[in-house]
Amino acid sequence: MIRRIGVLTSGGDAPGMNAAIRGVVRAALSEGLEIYGIYDGYQGLYEDRMEQLDRYSVSDVINRGGTFLGSARFPQFRDEAVRQVCVENMQRRGLDALVVIGGDGSYMGAKRLTEMGFPCIGLPGTIDNDVAGTDYTIGYFTALETVLEAIDRLRDTSSSHQRISIVEVMGRHCGDLTLAAAIAGGCEFIVLPEVPFSPEDLVSEIKAGIEKGKKHAIVAITELVCDVDELAKYIEKETGRETRSTVLGHIQRGGSPVAYDRILASRMGAYSIELLQQGYGGRCVGIQNEKMVHHDIVDAIENMKRPFKGDWLETAKKLF
C-alpha cells in the first residue's frame, strides 16, 4: 500500500512544472498520503535533499514559471551505484513511490529506478513536445505563445527594413514547436529536423518569393539543424537581402504558464496519484484526445514514436 510519495522535477525546466507539483501534492494529501519534495532532481535524490510538503507548500505556485523544487542535469545517475544510493535514501525516508516530472531523459531515470524495484510515475514536462505517449507536454503551449510573440515582433522590424529574419526555436530533434509557431506567425519558410534540409533549396524558395514581390520574410528553424548565423550570411550573399538571425534560447522556457498548461499539469499530477493508488508503477502519463492515459514507461522510451505532423506542414505550404 502506498503511504508516502516523493516528487521531483528533472532536466530542462518548463512552464507548468509548478502546477504539476501542486497537482501531485494536493491530490496526494486529499487521499491521506504523505508527500515529500525532492530538490534539484536526481542530484537532490542522491544527496538526500528532500522535505515533507503540505498544502501550503504549493500555495501561489500555479501561476509561476520554472520549478520551485529546482532541477539539475545529473549524468552520474547512469551509474548503478549512484542509483542504489538514491533507492536507499528513499527507503530510509519511508517513500513508497516517486513521481518524476521531466522529459525523455528524466523518464530514462524513472525507468532505471523502476527496474530496481522502486515504482515511478513519469509526467511529461518539456517545452519540446517530444515525449512519446502524449499529444502534448507540460510547458509546450506556454513556449508556443512565447515564440509566437517573438515572431510577431520580428515581423514588425523585418517589414520596416525589408529584411529576411531567421528565428531559431527550441525542440532538439522535434519540430512541433517550430511548426506550430510558424503557422500561427505566418512564417514564409519552415525548416524542421524531420525534413531533409538544403540551404540551396531554401535560397531558391526565397528568391522565388522576392521575384513575386515579397519584401520581407521570416524563416522559422528548429535548433541543431544548422548554424543559423552562417545560414543568415549565406542567404544574404545569395539574395542580396539583409538577413539577420535571432536565437530565442532559454527565454522560451520561462514565463507564467498559460491556462492550458496549468490545467494539463494539474490533471496529470492528480492522475499520477490515482495510478499509484491503483497499484501502478513504471508508467508514464499522457493526454490523448483530451483524455488522461498511461503507458509502460519502458515501452514509451524504447518503442513508441511521436508521429510527425506532415499534414500540418502541407497546410503551411499552401498558406505561404
Swiss-Prot record:
Binding partners and assembly: Homotetramer.
Residues at which ATP binds: 12, 73-74, 103-106
InterPro entries linked: ATP_PFK, ATP_PFK_prok-type, PFKA_ATP_prok, Phosphofructokinase_CS, Phosphofructokinase_dom, PKF_sf
Subcellular location: Cytoplasm
Regulation of its activity: Allosterically activated by ADP and other diphosphonucleosides, and allosterically inhibited by phosphoenolpyruvate.
Source species, domain of life: Bacteria
Family to which the UniProt record says this protein belongs: Belongs to the phosphofructokinase type A (PFKA) family. ATP-dependent PFK group I subfamily. Prokaryotic clade 'B1' sub-subfamily.
HAMAP family: Phosphofructokinase_I_B1
GO MF, any single term: identical protein binding
Positions of ADP binding: 22-26, 55-60, 155, 186-188, 212, 214-216
Reactions catalysed according to its record: beta-D-fructose 6-phosphate + ATP = beta-D-fructose 1,6-bisphosphate + ADP + H(+)
GO CC entries: 6-phosphofructokinase complex
Cofactor(s) required for function per UniProt: Mg(2+)
The EC number(s) this enzyme carries: 2.7.1.11
Key words, A-Z: Allosteric enzyme, ATP-binding, Cytoplasm, Glycolysis, Kinase, Magnesium, Metal-binding, Nucleotide-binding, Transferase
Pfam families with a match to the protein in the record: PFK
Binding site for Mg(2+): 104
Annotated organism of origin: Pectobacterium atrosepticum (strain SCRI 1043 / ATCC BAA-672)
Protein known as: ATP-dependent 6-phosphofructokinase
Main location: cytoplasm
Protein function: Catalyzes the phosphorylation of D-fructose 6-phosphate to fructose 1,6-bisphosphate by ATP, the first committing step of glycolysis.
GO biological process: one example: fructose 6-phosphate metabolic process
Position of the signal peptide: none
